[in-house]
Amino acid sequence: MRRGSAEMRAEMNRIFWAADSTVQTNDYTTYPQTGIGQVFPLFVKPEYQVCNHAKNGRSTKSFMDEGRLKAIEERIGAGDFLFIQFGHNDEKKEDPTRYTEPFSTYMENLETFIRVAKDHSAYPVLITPLERRCFMDEKHLGIGAHSDYVAAMKQTAEKNNVPLVDLYSMSRMELKKAGEKNSRRWYMFFPEGEYKNHPEKSEDNTHLRYDGAVNFASLIARGLKEIGGIYAEMLLDLSLIHISEP
């Protein structure tokens, strides 16, 4: 049943999140992998509920084709938010079930997500994809992994008058500041034997551990604060938040 009345909205504000594995909620079977949407509740007021629909490996195309956007459409209501964060899998040319062309089908798909939110009097927010850990040496990042998709998302935001959080640019700055070695702690990059349920070595430069998820979630929170208005109202006082791994 779709919730839309003012009375029900006063009880709980909902943030729906359509995205991929960088945002997905994980469990003990995939620990220490942690998604941004999994930890984002740490940054929002208790009257806001994060409804995380992010799923590993999905692009805008496969997310819709599998009925995942439809599932959001059946629940989202007036005053809710829809965070839209894709790019990692849209760029996979070798997979026709996921690939989208940045300045045509990708933009068209983003506009479909936006329409779903607006048709239900909800608030869409576009979030550029998280940068991969793509160092050339200790201090220098390589060419951005998602540059065309970032540019396409920015064009879509401007065309449709939708707020945008540029996580891509902010995460690149964070990676440059941290450097190659120090940034490993944010990603699934660790030696053999560090985790009991993941005993093998991992050099995954895309997926996150807890510290990384929290760090990049905080960047999204910062972006929402800069947008202001209802987007900032959902946030706790960021200056008072101190989070350590559970």
Predicted region positions:
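Serine-esterase "nucleophile elbow" of acetyl-processing enzymes
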Residues: 1-55, 70-81
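Gly/Ser/Thr-rich beta-alpha loop segments that engage phosphate groups in nucleotides
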Residues: 21, 59, 89
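Residue-level preference for alpha-helix termini and adjacent loops
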Residues: 22, 62, 205-207
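Acidic/histidine-rich helix-loop elements
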Residues: 26-32, 54-63, 93-101
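Solvent-exposed, flexible loop/coil residues
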Residues: 27, 40, 67, 212, ...
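Short, solvent-exposed polar/charged micro-motifs at secondary-structure junctions
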Residues: 60-64, 175-178, 244
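Alpha-helical cap/lid subdomain in secreted, periplasmic
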Residues: 67-214, 218-236
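Residue-level detector of conserved catalytic or cofactor/ligand-binding positions
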Residues: 239-246
